[in-house]
Amino acid sequence: MNQNENPAPKRENFASRLGFLLVSAGCAIGIGNVWRFPTVAGQSGGGVFVLFYLIFLLAMGVPVLTMELAVGRAGHGTATQAYRALEKQGAKWHLHGYLCLFGCCMLMMYYTTVSGWMLSYFVKFLTGAFSGLSGDAVSGVFGRMLESPGEMGGYMALTVVLGFAICSFGLQNGVERITKGMMCALIVLIAVLAVHSFTLSGAKDGLAFFLLPDWGRAVEQGIGSVLVSAMNQAFFTLSLGIGAMEIFGSYMNRDHTLTSEAVRICALDTFVAVSAGLIIFPACFSYGVSPDAGPSLIFITLPNVFTGMAGGRVWGTLFFLFMTFASFTTVVAVFENIIASAMELFHIERRRACVLGAAFILLASVPCVLGFNLWSGFQPLGAGSTVLDGEDFIVSNLLLPFGSLVYLLFCVTKWGWGFGRYLEEANAGEGIRLPRALKPLLQIVLPILIVLIIVQGLI
């Protein structure tokens, strides 16, 4: 690369291995762990789905995660700079780096709004806004929030400003320190909420529905459908393909193998997803409500459950504090990628990159907010869809799987970085080593599976 008169600031590093693991896991852990994984698992045979999910997570998620981390650690930069450092002369792999930045920005264009919903409900439960409300009234709170661009926009803006403010203090003093605190608090909240759920009358039935293998339910759902659902969940849970994880690889040292780190990140992510089910299903079975998936589970079903139980205001407050932390750790992690990219591309200091990033994300997030009210007539995916649905389709169905395929091909083919160089980087340090015998899986099987995911997402 050509030298610039104003070179980008010296690259930072994590202060500790624990910091890297918690920040990376915080990036992976998000709302999908709570509003999708438990319900899909319950509907798809409980333990049957969980077993298939773990198999696909080890076979797909861990290898692709090591590839994204390897590109970052070996290239010492964001996706664009790392590709440039590792690609052969004249190659164009670095163009995917710009697509990664676009993907991170588009993800935040709607994820900040959803994170704002979590913050809004935390405040509502904390202040007693749900106390004494009937079931219909509780359900109506969510609809009224969606109809209010002022309320949604306010919480979205607060999420954006807080996220970039944390990042402005730097990797160690801002992102790492705050995320470590939130992740530790999140784990404590999970433990408290799960123990409380175990004391409810329907805990036994709820846990059996969620965790015990039920082949009858799996066959009824369709074994093929269960396999596809498990594969999709294992693939999308880590948010691979848009460089969100790659940036943290660039902040790593080479003391530990990437497979060891990837397994630990996946374990933390799975722990939160399974724990969410341990919280949700006992509560739903105890109060005779159906655990739907998606926003209706979080903002309608569970608030009704909380308002009907003793001490519901406290448990609702703790649950939405947990959800706020789960979503906000992702926001901070992806913001860090956007900031680091701006610092490298425009050769500016971190504080200035934070201001520019915050201004851009604030403006770019407005369509998602207005898509539920003033712009509700714009339905990009057909009747009933919203701007959020359209943005999520682009990120989840296109950018994530396509980007993962690019990282995969770059790391395992002779036209990219090359399998040998990737394997050397992945196995540098102490810990679990990726065996060379997996080369056929990585070069043949994984690309086919990812292409199938892309095709399935488009039909």
Regions found by a protein language model. Give the residues of each.
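Transmembrane helix-boundary motif of multi-pass solute transporters/channels
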Residues: 18-56, 205, 243-249, 259-263, ...
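C-terminal membrane-solvent junction of multi-pass transporters and transport-like membrane proteins
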Residues: 95-96, 101, 346-358, 390-450
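Membrane-embedded translocation segments of transport machinery
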Residues: 2-3, 7-10, 14, 176, ...
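Membrane-interface "cap" regions at the ends of multi-pass membrane proteins
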Residues: 1-35, 64-69, 73-95, 253-257, ...
